[in-house]
Amino acid sequence: MISCLVIIDVQNGFLTNETNNVPDRIKELLSREKFDHIVATKYMNHEGSPCYKQLNWTSLMTKESQALDKYVESISERVFEKDTYSCFTDEFKEYLKKENITDLHFVGIDTDCCVLGSLYDAFDAGYNYKVYLDCCASCGGKKQHDSAVVVMERVFGKQHLITK
């Protein structure tokens, strides 16, 4: 079994009062858990992205807002850019296959958007998975985070959701 910590979208544009504790919580997680691989994703909004076209969402369109948190960047062996909620781009799927990764461990921002979207794809693709809830948060606040947790419990099973 080969594990990979997948750090979802811990970027300057997503670090708010609601989410700014995520990098420190990831650091704490890494002090108690070991993973074979650590990768990160970056959400890249642009005029052709679904969020821009369908939601008219214009945030995260500058290099500064798209930049990864410095700590996350320093620990990630690879960074995968995406313009969808899920991290399961062709490049990401090829990486998982090449590295024979079987177990995905998710942390990051937003619990109710990109973490949840990636979890659906991990489940459908047959990966073993865990979500470290104390290392996730939502820019929309605790209510959105908690709502996503309710969905995750029902759809993916409480046994896959880890709290400190």
Regions found by a protein language model. Give the residues of each.
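Short hydrophobic beta-strand that contains or immediately precedes a catalytic carboxylate
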Residues: 6-8
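Short acidic, Gly/Ser-rich segments with clustered Asp/Glu that frequently serve as metal-coordination loops
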Residues: 10-18
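Active-site-adjacent betaalpha module
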Residues: 2-4, 31-32, 37, 57-164
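Von Willebrand factor
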Residues: 33-48
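…and closely analogous acidic/polar surface helices at protein-protein or active-site interfaces
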Residues: 18-33
